[in-house]
């Protein structure tokens, strides 16, 4: 007898991914920084880049989120042509270090029926998974 492993259903809808906790909607903060379209962050990026495994105050977490969003906004402003996948560096102190280091991140830009686009910010190791799931 072959044992079957239950696979979770593929989540292809942005709202369903937010409800499932796979994506974190950071659109309100993005709007404060002049980003005019919906923005989400993947759960792994949220856990590594925003909340970390150190005890950070809510103010520190908000500051880290704003740093990531501003780095994305500055990269976007410097582009003459926008592609569906954009790399951008951000300075973050990743535990256990307290010294900010350049961290490569990516933005996956997709068409959105109600906005021009929506963006998901993710870690480099999540890029191939995202591209595979789009195919």
Model regions and ranges:
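Arg/Lys-rich, positively charged N-terminal/basic patches that mediate binding to nucleic acids
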Residues: 2-63
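Functional cores of ribonucleases/endoribonucleases
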Residues: 53-130
């Amino acid at each position: 007898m072959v044992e079957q492993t239950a696979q979770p259903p593929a989540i292809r809808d942005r709202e369903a991914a937010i409800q499932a906790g796979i994506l974190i909607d950071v659109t309100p903060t993005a709007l404060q920084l002049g980003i005019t379209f919906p923005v989400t962050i993947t759960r792994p990026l949220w856990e590594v880049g925003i909340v970390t495994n150190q005890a950070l105050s809510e103010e520190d977490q908000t500051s880290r989120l704003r740093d990531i969003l501003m780095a994305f906004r500055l990269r976007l402003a410097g582009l003459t042509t926008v592609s569906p996948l954009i790399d951008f560096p951000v300075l973050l102190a990743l535990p256990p270090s307290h010294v900010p280091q350049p961290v490569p991140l990516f933005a996956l830009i997709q068409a959105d029926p109600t906005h021009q686009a929506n963006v998901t910010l993710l870690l480099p190791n999540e890029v191939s998974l995202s591209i595979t799931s789009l195919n």
